[in-house]
């Protein structure tokens, strides 16, 4: 007969045998409350906005480049209208600056910005697809209105999808039509993802206590296993959720403080985060107006050195002195003053149409401004042709008057037809070329017999008479 001690031990073993099957995680195999799935919906919705944000950013960049091109064209038009003045030279400097800024912006758009936005869109769309598929499985896995994988806030009832919401929470589970929209960063920040559950569920924080959900366990008791538990844990939602192959609650990956890595179980989350934080947008220096002094603006110093000073590596003081000739200073205020003159410059009414604005600052669009610029360039070309034709007789007469003696006095730069330079000569290197002198004399005689020349320039015809040269100059 067993002793009292043995009887008590036997009774304890019987009780333990009855209790052990219950001593599993009370959250295992149970449905998920709204506290768990709502943040996933919020991330999904924000990822859905990434293609819209990309379109918004790319269009903004293109618009800024177009504005720079328009500014360059307006300045060029102003220079043509005011041809021959220092204001025109200032406008050429302005035009060159904006043309170079436009090129810089276009290069940034092609080489950097477009690649960034496409990468961010691709990684965000992929991650969204993985999240949406998981949420869709949770939504559909239910036994009744009170037992399933996706439960309401209290865990009392399963939730349903209506339009673009689940249980009243915005959660479309699909991509929206792509329309430009300013990008947001509410749930996907610089450090990681904001608001997602990030700890094991030890106290039924996001698992319900009685709603069954086979997607929450890898065990064969009310889980994904059949005759036995799964061979290993299963990851879901692109590595965010890990379903154990035992009767324990799911665990989730902490995503609020990510590190750059490769090959991680939650790699899609890392890739989308990396791509998003790498975005520079259309606010970088290539797309912004410059507030530096005139010499510090893109392209200005190089143009002044090469076109005006004709001297590379010029001193800063030399460049500033040269700029003062055209801007009355070298600070940003003088630049702004020229831009104001350009903006207020009127153009011919026939170029823009009746009852349309005629000030340059009110005109935009590459096609319109290019046409206006072509008009004024043709007009300038016509005026220049008039002067060229007027100058020919005087030039011919000067050439015809050259003698051996006058040629002998010229240096190499002055020695021009009908004079001829002889490098090997010892003394008189510039001499009169008799054959060339005869040709000049014949041409001069021919010009003297011709009354006038009819030349067409721009849209106007100019009748060239043998009038004094000073009259032609008045055309400017």
UniProtKB/Swiss-Prot annotation:
Keyword Disulfide bond appears in the UniProt entry: yes
Glycosylation sites (chain numbering): 289, 454
Record Gene3D superfamilies: Variant surface glycoprotein MITAT 1.2, VSG 221, C-terminal domain, Variant Surface Glycoprotein, subunit A domain 1, Variant Surface Glycoprotein, subunit A, domain 2
Compositional bias of kind Low complexity: 450-459
SUPFAM superfamilies per record: Variant surface glycoprotein (N-terminal domain), Variant surface glycoprotein MITAT 1.2, VSG 221, C-terminal domain
A Pfam cross-reference name: Trypan_glycop
Cysteine-cysteine disulfides: 41-171, 149-213, 407-419, 415-430
Membrane disposition: Lipid-anchor; GPI-anchor
Residues in the signal sequence: 1-26
Region (Disordered): 389-418, 435-459
Keyword Disulfide bond attributed: yes
Record's keyword terms, sorted: Cell membrane, Disulfide bond, Glycoprotein, GPI-anchor, Lipoprotein, Membrane, Signal, Trypanosomiasis
GO biological process: symbiont-mediated evasion of host immune response
Propeptide residues according to the Swiss-Prot or TrEMBL record: 460-476
Role according to the record: VSG forms a coat on the surface of the parasite. The trypanosome evades the immune response of the host by expressing a series of antigenically distinct VSGs from an estimated 1000 VSG genes.
Entry protein name: Variant surface glycoprotein MITAT 1.2
Organism of this sequence: Trypanosoma brucei brucei
